[in-house]
């Protein structure tokens, strides 16, 4: 069994999901306060106004909208984002495309599920919300972060958090949940 990574307490970590670059219908579907023409700039501003180049960003799925995302366009957008990005695969992601995007960079694709320890808490990440997760029964020591549901409301479960961009139109600082 692999040992779960411990992230240094000094790291600044942000969480987000479901950016849906190159998905025009998401603007209306999730009531994003922008137009088709300024959608990419709106997303970049939401991220870069908070995330610094030295920060870590975990993206929990659906970075771009499948076949709508031309690789060269995606590279151009990705090069403008602050932070070191770590990707969890979502239902609209093309894993090979994300891997190619990260090739030769400090960014990485982590697969469909990832967990680590940070400030004595177990952090569990998946694109989809889970009813239960590793460590959930151990009090407040384990926290699950997910995306997928955008701005839809689901039954609240202690220590389960939706970090979709559409939830509050922001990226989330992990420390705010600890």
What residue spans do the PLM features occupy?
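A short acidic-Thr-Gly-centered motif at the start of a beta-strand
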Residues: 1-8, 133-137
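Conserved beta-sheet core of the metallophosphoesterase superfamily
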Residues: 103-178
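Conserved catalytic motifs of the protein kinase core domain
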Residues: 12, 56, 142
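Core catalytic region of metal-dependent phosphoesterases/phosphodiesterases
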Residues: 6-7, 16, 21, 25-113, ...
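Short, hydrophobic/glycine-enriched beta-strand segments
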Residues: 13-18, 162-163
């Amino acid at each position: 069994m692999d040992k779960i990574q411990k992230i240094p307490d000094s790291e600044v970590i942000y969480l987000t999901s479901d950016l849906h670059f190159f998905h025009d219908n998401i603007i209306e579907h999730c009531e994003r306060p922008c137009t088709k023409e300024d959608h990419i700039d709106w997303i970049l501003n939401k991220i870069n106004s908070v995330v610094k180049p030295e920060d870590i960003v975990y993206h929990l799925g659906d970075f771009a909208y499948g076949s709508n995302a031309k690789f060269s366009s995606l590279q151009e957008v990705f090069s403008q984002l602050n932070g070191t990005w770590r990707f969890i695969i979502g239902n609209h992601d093309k894993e090979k495309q994300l891997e190619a995007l990260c090739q030769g960079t400090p960014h990485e694709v982590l697969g469909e599920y990832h967990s680590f320890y940070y400030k004595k808490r177990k952090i569990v990440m998946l694109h989809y919300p889970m009813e239960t997760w590793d460590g959930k029964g151990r009090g407040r020591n384990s926290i699950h972060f997910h995306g997928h549901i955008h701005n839809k409301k689901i039954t609240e479960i202690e220590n389960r958090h939706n970090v979709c961009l559409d939830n509050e139109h922001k990226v989330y600082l992990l420390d705010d949940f600890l």
